[in-house]
A protein has these predicted regions:
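S-adenosyl-L-methionine-dependent nucleic acid methyltransferase catalytic domains
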Residues: 1-125, 132-141, 147-156, 160-164, ...
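Short, conserved active-site loop motifs that form the nucleotide-linked donor/cofactor pocket
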Residues: 177
Length: 192
């Protein structure tokens, strides 16, 4: 991108884009290529920084769920998925998968996937059952359910029925289905 080129040349730069998907990509490049951190080395204007801002984004323009979804996915560095064929990050049917995080399994070197689903509206335990079914169908190691609302007790109970992902490299068990609220992510809580 132009920002990466400007940074490489030691120039001052300003980046402007209209989608949270593109903004996330710029932040990833700055971090991966130059070890620059948001807030420490540059600032982003226009992204939610608190729960009220996240709610406003979810409700903006009649609730453009894709902008909210793309922003929420960026909080866990998930690659957006959806649309037709290979059009990743496009609007369209996603079969219950909004984003994917690929990771290399320690000890085996196998590439595994964590599937991510984002919800900005009302959530229920059936959403967790659906994601659990998607994990099984897609043979994914882990599932993350990101929600703007606090999960109900039934949702938390349903998530525990998914069991654990046993990491051969770290010799640890991680909850296979994890529920994270936007508030959790904004305050620094990360998936296990």
């Amino acid at each position: 991108t132009a920002i990466a080129a400007a940074e490489k040349l030691g120039r001052r730069w300003i980046g402007i884009d209209i989608t949270h998907l593109s903004i996330a990509l710029m932040k990833y490049r700055l971090g991966d290529m130059f070890d620059l951190k948001e807030k420490a080395n540059y600032r982003v204007i226009g992204e939610p920084v608190d729960l009220a801002g996240a709610r406003a984004l979810a409700a903006k323009d009649g609730g453009d769920r894709y902008q909210f979804q793309w922003w929420a996915l960026s909080l866990v560095r998930a690659k957006p998925l959806g649309g037709d064929g290979g059009k990743q990050g496009k609007k369209g049917s996603d079969k219950g998968i909004d984003g994917v995080i690929s990771f290399t399994e320690g000890g085996t070197g196998r590439v595994q996937r964590a599937l991510v689903q984002v919800k900005s509206g009302g959530v229920k335990s059936g959403d967790i059952r659906d994601l659990k079914g998607t994990l099984d169908r897609e043979n994914a190691a882990i599932g993350l359910f990101i929600t703007l609302e606090k999960p109900s007790k039934d949702m938390l109970t349903e998530a525990t029925t998914a069991g654990f992902y046993k990491s051969p490299g770290w010799h640890m068990d991680y909850p296979r289905l994890q529920i994270l609220t936007i508030e959790d992510l904004l305050t620094g809580k990360a998936p296990l």
